[in-house]
């Protein structure tokens, strides 16, 4: 070690786990506010579960032979007590676990929603990350196709609220367990006839999860998959009536859809209705929301037999679409940036900034970066860059006279003058600023 300090290696974030920086946070806040307003309109209540759960929750709930459980989970052994734990790769199983554990269904069905980070160990690419965010709904205790239709309609309403276009709905029915079992037998027989043409992934799934072979993206297998037995042809009267009821409700609400017999979803807990919202604007990662019915899951995780359905959507993918379609809202600046010169002015500025905040105004008070006072010119540059509507200026003369100078940074002032600096008594500052902001807003509406 020399006398000179060695330069420390710069630390970076984990690949596929991204920072959300201030310039992007406004878009996240816009989306979150929009979706929360929508969910309130449908009577959904927020639930928040831990990001770490017992591994068994996912192996039992999602399915041991799914891609998520086999190769995508971040799992570890707790050094304190030897428990096998996992960073949640999805949240439906966790919400169901919480509902069972806290007896949430004792007094009837529940409409729940969540928003938060999920984790999957996979190759990062556009729209697919190792830490990603999902918003989702879980309608617990609802058995009819009307619940399926409602959660699908929620998605369409969200696209409308966000201004998104070109997102198309695909639906399918996975039927009941006995129907899937009969289809599985015939599907395996069919795929065995083409086993020499199947890729490694399809061969691995052939006897463990053959339904997932139908979801392959390998171009070389598309003809084989296209001619495979379709689960929809194995549906019994109950499953078909449920699927027909869903279609009738979607048509009644003028919501176009396509029946995709190859739509199977990657989680074992689904039955009856499954659906995806897809777009061609995100390349290979075209699914922006997906869900369906999972009636067996609550009993599977230790609860009483209870019907349920829900969906989840990838927040990052939706934000990509908003950027793609130039629907990013302009970030609003604060109301006031307070500038000051001299010790007496700094003290007075501090007091006034707090008083302005008491009235509900958003205020940035200039604070020195190096302990020394910045020049007036430098402070005004920062005020302008902050996006503030007004600069409130304290100098030695203003402090001596009990006044402040107010300079509009956007639009006009209280009297209609554009960017004209005015002297205002300190005791009248709040009223002046409110009137000035009203005038600015009206000027912007003209």
UniProtKB/Swiss-Prot annotation:
Predominant location category: cytoplasm
Keywords linked to the UniProt accession: Aminoacyl-tRNA synthetase, ATP-binding, Cytoplasm, Ligase, Nucleotide-binding, Protein biosynthesis
Subcellular location: Cytoplasm
A biological-process GO annotation: histidyl-tRNA aminoacylation
PROSITE patterns in alphabetical order: AA_TRNA_LIGASE_II (PS50862)
Classification via Pfam families: HGTP_anticodon, tRNA-synt_His
A GO term, aspect molecular function: ATP binding
Catalytic activity: tRNA(His) + L-histidine + ATP = L-histidyl-tRNA(His) + AMP + diphosphate + H(+)
InterPro entries listed in its UniProt record: aa-tRNA-synth_II, aa-tRNA-synth_II/BPL/LPL, Anticodon-bd, Anticodon-bd_dom_sf, His-tRNA-ligase, HisRS-like_core, HisRS/HisZ, HisRS_anticodon
Domain of life of the organism encoding this protein: Bacteria
Transmembrane region(s): none
Any one annotated GO CC term: cytoplasm
EC number, UniProt record: 6.1.1.21
Subunit structure: Homodimer.
HAMAP family attached to this UniProt entry: His_tRNA_synth
PANTHER family, alphabetized: HISTIDINE--TRNA LIGASE, MITOCHONDRIAL-RELATED (PTHR43707:SF1), HISTIDYL-TRNA SYNTHETASE (PTHR43707)
Family, per entry: Belongs to the class-II aminoacyl-tRNA synthetase family.
Protein name: Histidine--tRNA ligase
């Amino acid at each position: 070690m020399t006398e000179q300090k060695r330069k420390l290696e710069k630390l970076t974030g984990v690949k596929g786990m991204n920072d959300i920086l201030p310039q992007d946070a406004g878009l996240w806040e816009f989306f979150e506010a929009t979706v929360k307003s929508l969910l309130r309109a449908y009577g959904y209540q927020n639930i928040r579960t831990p990001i770490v759960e017992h591994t068994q929750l996912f192996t039992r709930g999602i399915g041991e032979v799914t891609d998520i459980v086999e190769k995508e989970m971040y799992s570890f052994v707790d050094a304190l007590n030897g428990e096998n734990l996992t960073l949640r790769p999805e949240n439906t199983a966790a919400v169901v676990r919480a509902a069972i554990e806290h007896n949430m269904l004792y007094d009837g069905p529940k409409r729940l929603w969540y928003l938060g980070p999920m984790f999957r160990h996979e190759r990062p690419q556009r729209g697919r990350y190792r830490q990603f965010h999902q918003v989702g709904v879980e309608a617990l205790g609802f058995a009819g196709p009307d619940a399926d239709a409602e959660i699908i309609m929620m998605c369409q309403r969200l696209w409308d609220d966000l201004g998104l276009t070109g997102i198309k709905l695909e639906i399918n029915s996975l039927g009941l367990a006995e129907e899937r079992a009969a289809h599985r037998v015939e599907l395996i027989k069919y795929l065995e006839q083409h086993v020499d043409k199947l890729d490694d992934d399809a061969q691995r799934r052939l006897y463990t999860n053959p339904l997932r072979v139908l979801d392959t993206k390998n171009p070389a297998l598309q003809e084989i998959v296209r001619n495979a037995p379709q689960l929809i042809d194995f549906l019994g009267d109950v499953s078909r009536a449920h699927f027909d009821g869903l279609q009738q409700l979607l048509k009644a609400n003028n919501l176009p859809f396509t029946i995709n017999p190859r739509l199977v979803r990657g989680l074992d807990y689904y039955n009856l209705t499954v659906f995806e919202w897809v777009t061609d604007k995100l390349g290979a990662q075209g699914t922006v929301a997906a869900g369906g019915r999972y009636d067996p899951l609550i009993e599977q995780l230790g609860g009483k037999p209870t019907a349920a359905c829900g969906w989840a959507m990838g927040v990052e993918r939706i934000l990509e679409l908003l950027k793609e379609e130039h629907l990013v809202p302009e970030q609003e600046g604060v109301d006031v940036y307070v500038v000051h010169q001299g010790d007496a002015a700094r003290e007075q500025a501090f007091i006034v900034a707090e008083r302005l905040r008491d009235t509900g105004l958003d205020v940035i008070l200039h604070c020195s970066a190096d302990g020394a006072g910045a020049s007036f010119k430098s402070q005004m540059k920062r005020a302008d860059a902050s996006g503030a509507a007004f600069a409130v200026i304290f100098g030695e003369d203003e402090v001596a006279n009990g006044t402040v100078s107010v300079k509009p940074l956007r639009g006009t002032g209280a009297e209609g003058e554009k960017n004209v600096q005015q002297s205002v008594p300190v005791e009248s500052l709040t009223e002046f600023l409110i009137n000035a902001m009203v005038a600015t807003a009206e000027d912007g509406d003209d």
